[in-house]
Swiss-Prot record:
This is DNA ligase. The keyword DNA damage applies. HAMAP family: DNA_ligase. It comes from Methanococcus maripaludis (strain C5 / ATCC BAA-1333). InterPro entries: ATP-dep_DNA_ligase (IPR050191), DNA_ligae_ATP-dep_bac/arc (IPR022865), DNA_ligase_ATP-dep (IPR000977), DNA_ligase_ATP-dep_C (IPR012309), DNA_ligase_ATP-dep_cent (IPR012310), DNA_ligase_ATP-dep_CS (IPR016059), DNA_ligase_ATP-dep_N (IPR012308), DNA_ligase_N_sf (IPR036599). It comes from the Archaea. GO terms for molecular function: ATP binding; DNA binding; DNA ligase (ATP) activity; metal ion binding. The active site is at residue 252. PANTHER family: DNA LIGASE, DNA LIGASE 1/3 FAMILY MEMBER. GO terms for biological process: cell division; DNA biosynthetic process; DNA recombination; DNA repair; lagging strand elongation. Keywords: ATP-binding, Cell cycle, Cell division, DNA damage, DNA recombination, DNA repair, DNA replication, Ligase, Magnesium, Metal-binding, Nucleotide-binding.
């Protein structure tokens, strides 16, 4: 399949803002592949359309930043001066390369047009290049691709290298296109995607005529992690009880979400970003290996513990453990980790359609019970032990007063609050559900992405000291909600400045526009209405709590979250 045929439809998708038209154009693309291509082509275009060449569960990236792409573009014959001027004018490196493509060295008239397969496999190889001369090799490969490409192709190649297609397409739109073209139930398609995290595989199976509901490759599998189910905000414990009848309360831990997979004695542990962190936490791996369980997927919260007090250490200590590549055992002696398991998603078969109460029974057979109302003495004793693997502390009750006691106790041992779950609910990967709620004592912190950075003043003059922060809407468009600089230490500023220099897209002098890759957790005095920002809200006195290296743009808060927090706080006043 010619890459140009794909790019023509990408161009149509980019030029419309209407969701239904984007869906129709992707249906047109599927039909073109059905007639002229191979099943694997739908796999490739499904991933490329959302700016990826790897499936999400693979947790691989092309690994090329804007600076390296600029270096590659310069070797094609486009001058740095012209390129920077065009980027400033258009705000997009892809469009800039397209507009300047007449300056790119010409190849022989007898050269073959670029194929989709060739472009796709070439970009996958980029991620594998390592060693002393790796940057030169990457520049040469990118340069050769751009020289072979026509102007429109060069636009999309440049964007894909940065994993940002800028065409307004997302997974739900592709799934809607699959549903329309192949005449399959949209909910079934969404559910299968949720347990595979592989839009390309799903597309390839559909166009090949697979019975997707009974295809074992499309079922939940050990060592293929899934996105976590997410909780809703709730104004109060009483409101959550109304929604969930007799709910299951659990301590909301001050830690990082993890998935533990085990099969044939092998253990892998994944972060909420689906990163394989197994090698960073060897002591947890060894403990899990000791337990007589196999062919299982567990979910829990990994907490860095102060064993002398039984309380959690700062969240950054968890990230220090997860990032560690050397002297891991020495770091393990300094920072003890513990996992509180709260769900089992697979045990010899998929369990996500099984009610929570039954999944919890399986979990407790493996790790024991921790019922707060009847086992408090045991729980408080074990908190101070060196035990590494626990079932989460829980309370089943519809008594709001008892629930508030449990909430206050959870705070007293250093954690964030409580989770409130419907015991009859299934597990819905990657969705924010109305069967699970969270309650915290203070305003909900927000996870935001940095979209611009500005050089600091005074003591901060050597770093980027102020950061424009944004949340996303349902279509994954970003909306600015404020600027933040307070709360960052000099070490934070130094680390952020280094990252900014690697991911800046456009230099405006004292300010730079960035790829949306830095996630910050921020607190604030309140959310207020504001005409300054298009979204209509702004954070008052935002302050950085921590840099969330365990999260990506997929994990940031939404415009709906902001509105909900605003409404909750307004009703409390």
């Amino acid at each position: 399949m010619l890459f140009n045929d794909f790019c023509k439809i990408l161009d149509k998708i980019e030029k419309t803002t209407k969701r239904l038209e984007k869906t129709d154009y992707f249906v047109e693309l599927i039909d073109f592949i059905k007639t002229n291509g191979k099943p694997e082509n739908l796999k490739q275009v499904s991933q490329i359309t959302i700016g990826r060449v790897f499936a999400e569960f693979e947790n691989k990236e092309i690994g090329i930043g804007p600076n390296l792409l600029l270096e590659a573009v310069k070797t094609t014959g486009i001058s740095e001066k012209d390129l920077k001027a065009e980027i400033k004018k258009t705000g997009d490196i892809g469009t800039a390369v397209e507009n300047l493509s007449s300056n790119i060295k010409q190849v022989s008239l007898f050269s073959q047009p670029l194929t989709l397969e060739e472009m796709y496999s070439t970009l996958k190889k980029l991620s594998e290049i390592e060693g002393n001369s790796s940057q030169k090799k990457k520049i040469r490969i990118i340069s050769n691709l751009l020289i072979l490409a026509n102007p429109v192709e060069s636009r999309y190649i440049s964007r894909l290298i940065l994993e940002d297609m800028r065409i307004g397409m997302n997974i739900p739109t592709i799934l809607a296109s699959f549903s329309n073209y192949f005449n399959v139930n949209k909910e079934n398609v969404e559910k299968i995607y949720a347990v595979t995290n592989d839009i390309g595989l799903l597309g390839e199976k559909l166009i090949s005529g697979s019975d997707i509901e009974n295809d074992s490759e499309l079922h939940l599998k050990v060592f293929r992690p899934i996105k976590p189910m997410l909780a809703q905000l709730t104004p109060s414990i009483e409101d959550a009880i109304i929604e969930t009848k007799i709910p299951q309360f659990e301590t909301k831990y001050d830690g990082a979400r993890v998935q533990v997979h085990k099969s044939n004695g092998e253990v892998k542990i994944y972060s909420r970003r689906l990163e394989d962190i197994t090698n960073s936490v060897p002591e947890l791996v060894e403990e899990i290996k000791k337990i007589d369980i196999d062919n299982i997927i567990l979910e829990g919260e990994c907490v860095a513990m102060d064993l002398s007090s039984g309380k959690p250490r700062p969240f950054q200590d968890i990230l220090r453990r997860f990032r560690r590549k050397y002297d891991i055992n020495k770091m393990a002696e300094k920072i003890a980790l513990r996992i509180y398991f709260f769900d089992v998603l697979y045990y010899n078969r998929g369990l996500i359609d099984t009610p929570l109460r039954n999944r919890r029974e399986i979990l407790e057979k493996l790790f024991g019970t921790n019922d707060w109302d009847t086992e408090l003495e045991k729980i408080e004793k074990e908190i101070l032990s060196k035990k590494m693997l626990f079932s989460s502390f829980k309370l089943n009750s519809d008594d709001p007063n008892l629930a508030k006691e449990f909430f206050n106790w959870s705070l007293s041992i250093g954690h964030e609050g409580v989770m409130i779950k419907n015991p009859d609910a299934p597990y819905t990967p990657g969705s924010r559900v109305k069967t699970m709620y969270k309650v915290k004592p203070t305003l909900e912190n927000l996870d935001v992405v940095v979209t611009r950075a500005k050089i600091g003043m005074g003591k901060r003059k050597d770093w980027y000291g102020s950061y424009e922060i944004s949340v996303k809407d349902d279509e994954s468009n970003l909306h600015v909600i404020g600027n933040v600089g307070s709360g960052l230490t000099e070490d934070d500023l130094e680390r952020l400045t280094k990252i900014v220099n690697e991911i800046k897209i456009e230099d405006l002098g004292e300010e730079v526009i960035l790829e949306p890759k830095i996630v910050l957790e921020v607190t604030y005095e309140e959310i207020q209405t504001s005409e300054k920002y298009e979204m209509g809200y702004a954070l008052r006195f935002p302050r950085v709590v921590q840099i969330r290296e365990d999260k990506s743009i997929n994990d940031i808060n939404t415009l709906d979250d902001v509105k909900k927090i605003y409404d909750i706080e307004r009703n409390r006043k």
